[in-house]
Amino acid sequence: MMVAARVVMAAMVVLAYAAGVSAAADETADKKLPIEQLIGMHDLTTAVSIGNYYLKQESLVAIRNLLTRLGKEEKLGPDWNLRNPLWQRAEDMLSKRVMAKVAEDFSTLEWLRPQWEDLDSREFSAAELDVLLTHFQSEVGRKQAKIVDHTVSTQVIMTLAFSGKLKDIAGVQEERSRMQHIWNKEDDDMRFSIEDATNADGQRFAYSALGKKYFVTAILKLTGIISHRIDELALALPKEVNARADQVRPLLQEFKSGRG
């Protein structure tokens, strides 16, 4: 009898565990569409432009270090420098190829979506996601989504600036101008009057427990994920650039031949 009772109890434990797993799977499935829709309310174009600007800067630093090293190895002399047309061709070639890789690994944000979905799934219940989605689909909610996006981009650039990572180097003017233009437009778009009576719902949401929780999740945690990705890619750039050394050697030989 005792053996039978133990078997029954073990079976009940297994069934309870299976039911728990099934319920968790059902809840995850219920969250999937609201999370996708909620993420779709946001636009991280500005944060991407900031990352592109910094990664272009770091790619040029790595490329110029490589070209300098190759010049020393090949004994090309002082004329092999940033002003030389063949250097510029080599730099441009490498820059385009490296930044194409950056576009794949960062700018598309394909890497971010799974992490963002997982973050929202961990932080919010299905009921909370429904409330969030309803709010952000409203006019004032869409405005607050822009505020979140702008705050994320501001935190990303502040992280880079305060850590001394942004440098003033030649070759990043286009990326810097684009970043500044997008940032300024986003700054204008997200502004609204707090005296407008229609913003009462927005203020109630901002001060609510769920609103505060969302802003912390979306701003602090999302910023951390983006900043980590930027740092990770920046650290990998020298290796990525050095692996392409053979691609510019014909230009070094052309420089040698032209020098006579």
Name every feature range the model reports, one short phrase each.
Residues 204-260:
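A cross-kingdom marker for long, charged
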Residues 46-55, 59, 63, 120, ...:
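Surface-exposed patches in mature extracellular/periplasmic domains of secreted proteins
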Residues 30-111:
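Early exported N-terminus immediately downstream of N-terminal targeting peptides
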Residues 18-26:
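Boundary at the C-terminal end of the N-terminal hydrophobic targeting segment
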Residues 1-9:
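Bacterial N-terminal signal peptides that target proteins for export
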Residues 62, 66, 89, 93, ...:
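Charge-rich, solvent-exposed alpha-helical interaction surfaces
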